[in-house]
Amino acid sequence: MCYQAIEDLLGYALRTGLIEECDRTWASNALLQAMKLESWEDPQTARERPLEDILRELLEDAAARSVIQNDAVSRDLFDTELMGILTPRPSQVISEFRRRYQADPKEATDWFYRFCQDTDYIRRYRVARDRKWTAATPYGELDITINLSKPEKDPKAIAAAKAAPQTSYPKCQLCRENEGYAGRLNHPARQNHRIVPITINQEDWFLQYSPYVYYNEHCIVLNGHHTPMKIDKATFRKLLDFVKQFPHYFVGSNADLPIVGGSILSHDHFQGGHYTFAMEKAPVERTITFRDFEDVEAGIVKWPMSVIRLRCEDDQRLVELADRILAAWRGYTDKAAFVFAETDGEPHNTITPIARMREGQFELDLVLRNNITTEEYPLGVYHPHQELHHIKKENIGLIEVMGLAVLPARLKDELNGVARALVRGDDLRADETLAKHADWAEELKIRHVFTAENAEDLLRQEVGAVFAQVLEHAGVFKCTPEGRETFLRFVQSV
C-alpha cells in the first residue's frame, strides 16, 4: 500500500506551508478518500524526497488498484486532485497576497510564484525538461526554447476525449471558472490553481501564472469576463495601470487579429513577468517626434519587427499618443510598401503593445502588425515564410515578438537527428522525419565543418539565425534603407 507515500506528501505540504500541523489528520483522511483507501497505517516519519517521485508512487498505486486509468491524461487529472486537497482556499491565498503586497509588490509576486510551484500547478520537474539557450544575432541575444513541459496526449486519451460528452464549461482555459475545476479528458484539472483579483482601468481582472513558464515569472493577466481580445485605447490604459501596480513586471498583449495574434483570441488577456527580453534591450536607432506630443520621447527600435518606443513620466500622455498611433495604423495603406489597411472589408492592421517601467518612466513599445495573405503567402505575408516552417510555422505572438522563440517539441529529436547526419554525412532526404531540414542542412554544410564535438552548438546558433529571419519576415517595414524610409512615411502620417 501507499501509506508511506501519503505520509511523504503530507510532510512535503507541511514543509512548503500548504498545510499546518493541525490540518494533518484532515488532510490524510482526504488523501485516503481520493486513493480509495478506508484505513490508515502510520509510517511514523515522512521521507523528504522530490514531489515528482512521491506523486509517481501514488499514481502507480492508484493505477494498479484501478482507481484511475493508466494513461497520461488520467494521471495528470488525478495527481492534480491530490494536490488540490492540500492547496489553501482562494480566500486564504488572496489574503496572504494582499498582506505581502502592502509591504512590497515584489514580495507578493515572489511569494505567489513560489506558491504556484509548491502546489504543483507549475510542475517544476516538467519545466526543467525544456531545452533553452541563447543565440547571438544582429539584433542581440535571442532566447530559444523547445517546449517540452506541455504534456502530449497519447492516442488512447485522445480517443477517450472524443467519445466524452462535450461541455462548454469553463468556456476556455483562461476563464476564472478554471479555479478549482476538476478537469476532464479534454480539459486540464485545476484544483490546485489560484488566481488573485486586481483592478485595472476600473475593471475586474485577475493575476495568475502560466503553468508552462516560458520565462521567469511568466504571468497571465485575464479579464474576469469571457470577452474577445481587443486592442484599443482602453488596452493601453490597462497595461500601464498594471505596471503602475507591479513596476518590476513588464506586461503586453497579443494582437487582436488572426495570424498575428496569439493562440487564444476568444478571451481578453495579457502576458507579463519578471524578465528582460532582447527587444527591451534593443536600442532606439532613430529618434522621432509626434506633433502635439513633443514631451513624449519616441523612437524607432533597432529590431527586426517594426517597433515604435514611447517614454514619458505621464502615463496618460502615453495612452493618448498610443491611441493616435493605433488609429493611424488601423487606417494606413501604402501600396508601394505592400501595406493595406483592409481588403474586401477585412481589416489587416493592428498593434502588439508592451508596457514596462524604466528608470522611473513609463514605456510603451508598439509593434506594428499586418495579417494580409496572398496566393504566394497563404499563411501571411508578414508571417514566417515556407522555407522557415521546418523550424517555426506557428503564429508569431507576443512572446516571439519580444525575442523568445517557443519552438515545438518535435525539434528536440529532429535537431539531434540533423546533428548526427551532418557529422556522419548521411542523406537527410532518406529520413521522412528529417527531410524537411535537408535544404537548410545543405546550406549549413557550406558554412561549417561539423564534428561530434561542435554539431550541437553550431545547430543551436543556426536555429537562432532562423528565428531572427522569422522575426524579419513578420516585420512590416524591413530593416533596410528602403524599409526604414517607408516606416518614416507612416510615422509622418500620424
Which ranges hold each PLM region?
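Active-site microenvironments that recognize anionic phosphate/pyrophosphate groups
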Residues: 1-221, 225-228, 302-304, 318-322, ...
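Helical scaffold of the NTase/Pol beta-like nucleotidyltransferase catalytic core
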Residues: 192-194, 224-251
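Catalytic or ion-translocation cores adjacent to nucleophile or general acid/base/metal-coordination motifs
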Residues: 234, 243-266, 272-326, 330-333
